[in-house]
């Protein structure tokens, strides 16, 4: 069995880890970084670029550079969270036929799982380059508070990327696994995970290799992106006050503001004040305009005060659901890049009444935990048991539009639960099962996961038929529901893919598209390598022609020059084979040059042309006769 990789598919950055020699290690990407920006760009030439390369060109290509796509995954277009994103996004977010939020880039629509798959492919390739072998099995992390459709969409992304997703694991649980793997004592810990786009808090009990999640809570639309947006709005408002120009209407300027905001936020974690300098940010009739502002840490904290206040509620709820007080929690583990912000650390300290533990790398710990879980599933890591929970209650709609819960939130998974219901009317031939997820009392206020019908119920007075509804949640937190007429034994089931999820046909098509793109990428890489080789061949041959061209036959020299011209003609070709063929032909023709150079080297002064004296070799270590060497005796004077 090949290696199982652990991938932290983050909103802002992604990371990949594996178990090697019994230890989890984070793998650096081709640029040498241990984290990769979760960005995908589509260039004018039709090329797809990922990670740091995509981030570098974002300012000049804002409409076709996708970021924070995780905030759209598994979400409907009509939700408030998506509407909020549409208002500030430089790229187009559109409504798909199934009601999902998709993106439109260069007149082509893409689903969030499809874009996430491109990022996952980059992480897969990073691992493959390091291991020197093909990787197919993976553990992928998701925010603990992701609902069923978001989990399913993440699993779909893995499939599109050509991965066999062995397990979807919650990010705080993965972090706890990385933190507690070598801990021997029993501990109650809280994992506070504030990343680029999501916020989770989980309370766990650790001991004897058992990691038991007691409760989880969070907000899947709160993270570093929101803090950045506060700074962007402040910069735009200040510039408008000063210059009378609203930069929000200029997508290129807005992208520069985004980069500056992120940089300023990071700098203010280590200093009390930072400068924001953006020359030539825009122009009007009077000429170019420059932006120069100072932002203090105190100002940043006041701008983000409402976001900082939002952190307390989920923490209090998680502790209450776990049946613990703040004083009973032994350690608070900080996860996610946003936990570097001093105001966040201070807020955590106030909520839990203790200094949080900074012993783990907040950017890498989730991927490390996923890598460990991969080792557990493969059998490389022994004596580790992970008991996770479902973050939200699950149930069905019953008479009067009420949500009847079958599985309460924070129930340990995998789990299975059944309940018997009946008909609401006489001679009812079918029942419609409306599956929901959430904590509100009325069905309409919760998230619909799916609908299905159980038909063929024999005529009977209301309340007589016995319909058994069973909920089954697997270890990935993905829901399966079945309904059975106990009278006839007739059964109908549904594997929840969410009413807005991708169909099997759509996923299969996206898998094929991803495979064809991978083949295209390989072809492009081979062409670039062939071009580089050809370029090197042309350079060395032309150099040799200058040096010894007069030593070869004029006809042969003409042949070589023709072959150089032929190779230059095909250099721009996308076909690696054509370039290689022309390179080989030039190499063959250039053999005569190599012979001439060798002959010239043989005749050069100092070469092995010493005639009869060659037999009289100098002894090893002897000095040449013309060197001024003085031989002298010495006498040791004893004191």
From Swiss-Prot:
Gene3D superfamilies: 1.20.1270.10, 3.30.420.40, Actin, Chain A, domain 4, Substrate Binding Domain Of DNAk, Chain A, domain 1. InterPro entries: ATPase_NBD (IPR043129), Chaperone_DnaK (IPR012725), Heat_shock_70_CS (IPR018181), HSP70_C_sf (IPR029048), HSP70_peptide-bd_sf (IPR029047), Hsp_70_fam (IPR013126). Keywords: ATP-binding, Chaperone, Nucleotide-binding, Phosphoprotein, Stress response. Induction: By stress conditions e.g. heat shock. GO terms for molecular function: ATP binding; ATP-dependent protein folding chaperone; unfolded protein binding. The modification Phosphothreonine is found at residue 198. SUPFAM superfamilies: Actin-like ATPase domain, Heat shock protein 70kD (HSP70), C-terminal subdomain, Heat shock protein 70kD (HSP70), peptide-binding domain. Residues 622-639 have a biased composition (Basic and acidic residues). Residues 601-639 are annotated as: Disordered. It comes from the Bacteria. Belongs to the heat shock protein 70 family. Acts as a chaperone. This is Chaperone protein DnaK. It comes from Trichlorobacter lovleyi (strain ATCC BAA-1151 / DSM 17278 / SZ). The gene is dnaK.
């Amino acid at each position: 069995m090949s290696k199982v990789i652990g991938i932290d598919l983050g909103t802002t950055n992604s990371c990949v880890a594996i178990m090697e020699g019994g230890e989890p290690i984070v793998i650096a990407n081709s640029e040498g970084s241990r984290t990769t920006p979760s960005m995908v760009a589509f260039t004018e030439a039709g090329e797809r670029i990922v990670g740091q390369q995509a981030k570098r060109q974002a300012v000049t290509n804002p409409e076709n550079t996708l970021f924070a796509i995780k905030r759209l995954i598994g979400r409907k277009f009509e939700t408030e969270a998506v509407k909020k994103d549409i208002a500030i996004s430089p790229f187009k977010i559109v409504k798909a036929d199934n009601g999902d939020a998709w993106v439109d880039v260069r007149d082509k629509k893409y689903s969030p799982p499809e874009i996430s798959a491109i990022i996952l492919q980059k992480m897969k390739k990073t691992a493959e380059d390091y291991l020197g072998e093909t990787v197919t099995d993976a553990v992928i992390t998701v925010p603990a508070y992701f609902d069923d459709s978001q989990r399913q969409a993440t699993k779909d992304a893995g499939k599109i990327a050509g991965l066999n997703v062995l397990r979807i694991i919650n990010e705080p649980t993965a972090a706890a696994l990385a933190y507690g793997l070598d801990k021997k004592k029993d501990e109650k810990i809280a994992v506070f995970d504030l990343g680029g786009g999501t916020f989770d808090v989980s309370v766990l009990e650790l001991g004897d290799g058992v990691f038991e999640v007691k409760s989880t809570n969070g907000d899947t639309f709160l993270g570093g992106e929101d803090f950045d947006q506060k700074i962007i709005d402040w910069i735009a408002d200040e510039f408008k006050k000063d210059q009378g120009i609203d930069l929000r209407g200029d997508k290129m300027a807005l992208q520069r503001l985004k980069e500056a905001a992120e940089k300023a936020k990071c700098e203010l974690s280590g200093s009390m004040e930072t400068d924001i300098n953006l020359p030539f940010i825009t122009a009007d009739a009077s000429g170019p305009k420059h932006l120069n502002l100072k932002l203090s840490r105190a100002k940043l904290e006041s701008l983000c005060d409402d976001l900082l206040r939002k952190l307390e509620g989920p923490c209090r709820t998680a502790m209450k659901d776990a049946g613990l007080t703040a004083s009973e929690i032994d350690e608070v583990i900080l996860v996610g890049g946003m936990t570097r912000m001093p105001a966040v650390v201070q807020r955590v300290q106030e909520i839990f009444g203790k200094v949080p533990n900074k012993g783990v790398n907040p950017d890498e710990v989730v991927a490390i935990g996923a890598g460990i879980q991969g080792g557990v599933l493969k059998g490389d890591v022994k004596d580790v048991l992970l008991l996770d929970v479902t973050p939200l209650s699950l149930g069905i709609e019953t008479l009067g539009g009420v949500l009847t819960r079958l599985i309460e939130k924070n129930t340990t998974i995998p789990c299975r639960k059944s309940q018997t219901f009946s008909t609401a009317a006489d001679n009812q031939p079918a029942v419609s099962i409306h599956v929901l997820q959430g904590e509100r009392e009325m069905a309409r206020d919760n998230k619909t996961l799916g609908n299905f019908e159980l038909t063929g119920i024999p005529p009977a007075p209301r309340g007589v038929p016995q319909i058994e509804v069973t909920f089954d949640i697997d270890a990935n937190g993905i829901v399966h529901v079945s309904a059975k007429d106990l009278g006839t034994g007739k059964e109908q089931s549904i594997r929840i893919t969410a009413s807005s999820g991708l169909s099997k046909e759509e996923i299969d098509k996206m898998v094929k598209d991803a495979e064809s793109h991978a083949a295209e990428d390989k072809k492009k890489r081979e062409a670039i390598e062939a071009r580089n080789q050809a370029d090197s061949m042309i350079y060395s041959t032309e150099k040799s022609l200058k040096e010894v061209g007069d030593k070869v036959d004029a006809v042969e020299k003409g042949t070589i020059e023709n072959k150089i011209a032929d190779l230059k003609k095909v250099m721009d070709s996308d076909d690696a084979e054509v370039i290689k063929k022309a390179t080989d032909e030039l190499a063959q023709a250039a053999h005569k040059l190599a012979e001439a150079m060798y002959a010239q080297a043989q005749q050069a002064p100092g070469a092995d042309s010493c005639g009869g004296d060659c037999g009289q070799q100098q002894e090893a270590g002897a000095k040449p006769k013309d060197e001024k060497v003085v031989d002298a005796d010495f006498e040791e004077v004893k004191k």
